């Protein structure tokens, strides 16, 4: 590995794992893949300790950093969802000897990654094709990702700058589109009261859909995890297969609604750990039909690309993109 002259430490911090890499902001491909490392967060008392361990292991001293964290960033502080770490930007920067340290939400990083994605990093899910555009060309993108929950955001590109749009769109109320979905909503309403999109389109959402379909059929499926449903569907189980089909159709409807709400006419990127597991189903299900089925806007929606992100380190890529964009900021601009 040849370290860049001014390396930036980038990180993608979740509740279980911490991923680190170096970025070269002057390179055409800023994320240095051969520097990527992953550690269990339980092995360290703080993010600063984990970052210092990584830098010592790789033998490089960075002076700047961009850390994407799975939790809310509030000024100088970030809290990791499902982990007791409370991160202070200023204290962590001092501990590492950094002149600059940015803390960003992990889904903001997923959105920023769009600016560096290449055609080989995505798989088209029906509809129109997509090619990266020059950074100087205005673009509006949407990003949606089912995992433990449902992340929804966007990326606005203007005048060579990238602006991630952070939202809580996963908590928008679920709008059923068929009689079957109305019945599913009724069943889930008995359990949760208000039913958001996240109650269906995420890993636990697969279980919720399967449980509702089982109740409609008068069957008790017993305790299940998302991986059990995908495995049963792959083995040809009819109810599990219907669960996946319904998941994909609802996912498409919600992703299409996001385009209308955000004006994300240049494409929607599907991210998260669940997408690769159901990719084949997405491509051969009602995802795209429901994505496009938007009344008077159906013709326009047919021209909006929908793309599954397959890059193995999209969070790190997004942190690297943020570092690159920060260098484009004019003196006095906030980033």
Swiss-Prot record:
Q: Name one GO biological process term.
A: glycolytic process
Where in or outside the cell it occurs: the entry states: Cytoplasm
Q: Which InterPro entries match?
A: ATPase_NBD, Bacterial_glucokinase, Glucokinase
Write out the entry's keywords from A to Z: ATP-binding, Cytoplasm, Glycolysis, Kinase, Nucleotide-binding, Transferase
* Reaction equation(s) it catalyzes: D-glucose + ATP = D-glucose 6-phosphate + ADP + H(+)
Q: Which GO terms describe its cellular component?
A: cytosol
Q: Which EC number(s) are documented for this chain? A: 2.7.1.2
Enzymatic class: transferase
Where does the chain bind ATP? 11-16
Q: Name one GO molecular function term.
A: glucokinase activity
Q: Which family does it belong to?
A: Belongs to the bacterial glucokinase family.
Q: What is this protein called?
A: Glucokinase
The primary gene name is glk
């Amino acid at each position: 590995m040849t370290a860049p002259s001014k390396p930036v430490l980038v990180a993608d911090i979740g509740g279980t794992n911490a991923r680190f890499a170096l970025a070269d902001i002057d390179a055409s491909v800023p994320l240095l893949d051969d520097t990527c490392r992953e550690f269990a967060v339980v092995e360290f008392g703080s993010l600063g300790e984990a970052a210092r361990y990584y830098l010592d292991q790789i033998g490089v001293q960075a002076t700047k950093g961009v850390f994407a964290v799975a939790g809310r960033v509030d000024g100088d502080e970030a809290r990791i969802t499902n982990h007791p770490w409370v991160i202070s930007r200023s204290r962590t920067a001092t501990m590492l000897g950094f002149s600059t340290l940015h803390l960003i939400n992990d889904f903001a990083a997923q959105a920023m990654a769009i600016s560096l994605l290449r055609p080989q990093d995505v798989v088209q899910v029906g509809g129109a094709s997509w090619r990266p555009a020059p950074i100087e060309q205005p673009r509006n993108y949407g990003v949606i990702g089912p995992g433990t929950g449902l992340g929804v955001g966007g990326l606005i590109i203007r005048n060579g700058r990238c602006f991630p749009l952070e939202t809580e769109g996963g908590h928008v109320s679920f709008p059923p589109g068929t009689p079957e979905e109305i019945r599913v909503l009724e069943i889930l309403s008995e359990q949760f009261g208000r039913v958001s999109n996240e109650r269906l389109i995420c890993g636990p959402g697969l279980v919720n859909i399967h449980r509702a379909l089982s109740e409609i059929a008068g069957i008790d499926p017993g305790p299940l995890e998302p991986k059990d449903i995908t495995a049963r569907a792959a083995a040809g189980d009819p109810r599990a297969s219907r669960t996946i089909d319904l998941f994909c159709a609802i996912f498409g409807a919600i992703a299409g609604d996001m385009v209308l709400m955000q004006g994300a006419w240049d494409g929607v990127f599907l991210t998260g750990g669940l997408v690769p597991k159901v990719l084949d189903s997405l491509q051969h299900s009602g995802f795209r039909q429901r994505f496009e089925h938007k009344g008077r806007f159906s013709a326009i929606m047919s021209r909006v690309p929908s793309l599954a992100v397959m890059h193995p380190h999209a969070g790190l890529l997004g942190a690297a993109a943020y570092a690159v964009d920060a260098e484009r900021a004019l003196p006095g601009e906030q980033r």
